[in-house]
Regions:
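Internal alpha/beta loop-helix hairpins
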Residues: 2-69
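A conserved hydrophobic position in a structured secondary element of the catalytic/binding core
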Residues: 21, 30, 86, 135, ...
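Short coil/loop residues immediately preceding or within conserved phosphate-binding loops
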Residues: 53, 104, 118
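Short, surface-exposed charged micro-motifs
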Residues: 55-57, 111, 122, 152
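Short, conserved beta-turn/loop elements at beta-strand boundaries and strand-helix junctions
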Residues: 63, 112-118
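OB-fold (S1/OB) nucleic-acid-binding surfaces
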Residues: 64-69, 123-131
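Glycine/charge-rich catalytic "coupling/switch" loops of P-loop NTPases
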Residues: 67-113, 138-175
Length: 175
């Protein structure tokens, strides 16, 4: 049975194999977890909601962004330009400094948008990185997280997806 949908809830609950087709081409085919957590390219990542995408230089266990901010990775990589991604639900927010020192940043909440059961929270870190988190409303209340307030954000090295190839984002032009 083939079912076509843009509803990610349906994909995750009903689909055991997922295909992402964009521009008339099969971009990725696999189980839902792999497609959502390890997208094949930027197009698939953006389509499945991986909003935190960063172009960087990877070397060893570090990803270095152009603004000097670095992320700790879950493996070791040879020096190369890459794209990395972090899903919004993997970003943890806290009004108090967490114990973790890996991928820990301090920043200001610039927007809160309701997405049903969760809120999309956009933050700008002191280092100049824009991070999007997906947070349950109860966590917003208990963490005292509001627009204009500052808070801590963190994510584990395991939550960072390092894309196999670096493909620069290009504009699609009609001919």
């Amino acid at each position: 049975i083939v079912m076509v949908t843009h509803d990610f809830g349906e994909v995750l609950s009903l689909g055991n194999r997922v295909a992402v087709i964009s521009g008339g081409k099969l971009q990725q085919w696999g189980n839902a977890r792999t497609v959502f957590r390890e997208p094949a390219n930027r197009n698939v990542a953006e389509f499945v909601g991986m909003k935190n995408l960063f172009e960087c230089e990877v070397q060893g266990e570090t990803a270095l962004l152009s603004n000097g901010v670095s992320f700790l990775l879950r493996g070791s990589y040879s020096p190369e330009r890459r794209l990395i991604g972090i899903r919004p639900e993997d970003v943890v927010l806290s009004s108090t400094r967490p114990q973790s020192l890996a991928n820990l940043f301090y920043g200001r909440v610039v927007s809160l948008v309701s997405r049903g059961m969760a809120f999309e929270v956009v933050l700008h870190s002191k280092g100049g990185v824009r991070i999007t988190a997906s947070v349950l409303s109860s966590a917003l209340v208990s963490g005292n997280i509001r627009v204009g307030e500052e808070c801590w954000m963190s994510f584990s090295p395991e939550s960072i997806h390092v894309f196999r190839q670096y493909i620069q984002k290009t504009e699609v032009q009609a001919i």
